[in-house]
Amino acid sequence: MTVQVFAERPTTQVAPTFAPTFLTALTGGDPAWDVRRGASAPESVEQPTEVVRILAFLDTEVDPDAVDREGEIPPFLIARLRDLGAFRLATSQDLGGLGLTPYTLFRAVEAVASRSAAIGFMLGVHNGIGVATSLLPTLPHGSLRDLIRRRSAEGMISGFADTEPAGQGNRWPRTTADPTPDGSAYVLKGDKLFISNGPVADLLGVTVTVRDEDGPRVGLAVVDTRSPGFEVRADLEYLGVRGLPNGWLRLKGVTIPRDHVVTVAQGDPRHTPERMSAYLTARMLIQAAPALAIARNCLRWSREFTARRRVDGIGLGEYDLIQRTLAANAAEVRAMDAVVRWSLGAPAPGDRWFERMFARNFCTEAAARVVDRTVSLLGGEGVETDRSKRRRGAPSVPLERAFRDIRMLRTAGGVDDLADAQAAQALLAHVADTAPAGLAADAFADTLPATENLSPRNARHLRDLYEDLARFPAACRDVGARTAGERERRAQQYPLLLLGRIARELLGTAAVLATAEQDGHQRLTDVHCTAARFRLRDLWAQLDAPDHPDHAGIARAVLSRDRHVDDLLGL
């Protein structure tokens, strides 16, 4: 038999929320501000000794520019990282790992990514969606559990292979698992594409369609990459995060024991609450952690650049536009940190699926704004490559690499726009199941908290937040009605995207306001909330607009090579 990890019917919904979560403010009629006060206090930011050793190795023996230039993390470097325990950060202590909490693990990956986004990404994949993290905790006792535990203790590298040439997340994977004649094993056949860690992994989770006599089922196969028939067809290279091990994989008759395929009684093992929770945390490790690392680097580079530059004898930092750039970058970094702390650093982070779902795009989008401002700021000395600046003896920073890396992080694992729309769909599904009927627009009118710990401007931001929260349930109902069917969702993706972005901005605003009550940094909070308020006004205006331009008609004309349109556009 295949291994069944859950006896009950799985669900495509994320696990019910039990801990205090911002989701209750959006959909449940209870802002619960007093619960949020103090709820996201950070754990110690001091890195464990083992992580400090990894960082020292990266600082003294690794050239991130060479990794980016050559597009490869050299095998000797990976071997050394293995020896230093970099692939056992999340492994339980009884297996020789550090057993880091999700928040501490995030900080470790962020620190590594501040040296090299590619290496940080690689560690995020392994420690986030590798089989030891995403699958082992749910496995019953047996040979598969024993295998993963043994290889984890050895410091294996892992990943997860789902995407295929036909796309990502298809209901039925085209990679198949057929039983052998005696029924003791499965034979796997198919291709997987864009698989991070695939070329260097020891064990891989692989999504398959199991073709048993009882009918097809989706399964998760655990594959030893040393098995005959496993092949890395090509190493893939990207615009950013260059050097990340990523490949086109082929399984050509790979035979694995029958109990190395995991299924559920009904449904898809990819969509169980436990698996989805692991996936959401992994997205933060893989994308949000490097994004925050890049944003912090840009803030440091901006400060150093501004401190040494003068115009007409006046320090650059005395100019209004420069001050606004530095303040905006600082506020973005603090907001990202606040969202991460709320999502992972508070008690019961596993319950906060909403925060983790939106934190990925919150961090990557904020980091993209920081990088863009930094390019403009440092562009005053020339939009020049690091290599060119070194040639002429000018102070240099790897800003070009950061620019490419953040663009990659915004699309890795799913295009950013689509991620916002999908997050909104998950939110609407939750609303349909749990939201109280007839929630009034003034549901929060009598629940405004005392604001003695906030500055007058931030107190106004808090009141604005409550007003947005009051109107959000009605917006959910409206967008839900517009996108009720499959056809409507395809034709009305933009309202979903807008709803997702509104929710994301509200989450960030709440996180920084709650943080301001803890640490007293009112000015940074004000800068972020003011910028977020302008973004929210635009998003609400678009969502409420009675009609829109004919985007569909223009797109059809462009795709059909309409002669008149082509002539107008010079195509």
Feature roles, as predicted:
Residues 1-126, 147-150, 570:
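Amphipathic, small/basic residue-rich leader segments at the start of a protein or domain
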Residues 3-25, 382-458, 548-571:
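Glycine-rich phosphate/cofactor-binding loops in nucleotide/flavin-utilizing enzymes
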Residues 83-149, 154, 197-200, 333, ...:
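Internal helix-loop-helix
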Residues 185, 189-232:
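A short core secondary-structure module
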Residues 228-257:
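Flexible, small-/acidic-enriched active-site or ligand-binding loops
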Residues 250-283, 300-316, 441, 449-450, ...:
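A glycine-rich, basic-preceded beta-loop-alpha segment at the flavin cofactor/substrate interface
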Residues 333-364, 368, 375-385, 508-555:
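C-terminal helix-coil-helix/basic helical segment that borders enzyme active sites and/or dimer interfaces
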Residues 445-571:
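C-terminal amphipathic alpha-helical interaction region
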